[in-house]
Amino acid sequence: MALSLFTVGQLIFLFWTLRITEANPDPAAKAAPAAVADPAAAAAAAVADTASDAAAAAAATAAAAAKAAADTAAAAAKAAADTAAAAAEAAAATARG
């Protein structure tokens, strides 16, 4: 019997989710046995992970701010060019008569 596209889609999603879960296991699940074995090392790893997350967030914020600044500069340049073109057109119309 033929499987419906919906069922095929569900199976693909299931296997895709399982593959991602196996490739990137839950950090909390990995940290629990490590915390029992060596609490100091587990705490240091948690601090390092938090620091890397903070650094990634800061980098993303800086990138967003740079993009916003570039977009603002581009919009200002376009507005200035449009204003200059309108002024030149008005001057030409005045000179014609």
From Swiss-Prot:
InterPro entries xref list: Antifreeze_1 (IPR000104)
Keyword Glycoprotein part of the UniProt annotation: no
Main location: secreted
Keywords: Antifreeze protein, Repeat, Secreted, Signal
Propeptide regions on this chain: 24-48
Molecular function in Gene Ontology: antifreeze activity
GO cellular component: extracellular region
Coiled-coil regions listed: none
Subcellular location: Secreted
Tissue: Detected in blood serum (at protein level).
Signal peptide: 1-23
Record-stated family: Belongs to the type-I AFP family.
Function: Contributes to protect fish blood from freezing at subzero sea water temperatures. Lowers the blood freezing point. Binds to nascent ice crystals and prevents further growth.
Protein name: Ice-structuring protein
Species the sequence originates in: Myzopsetta ferruginea
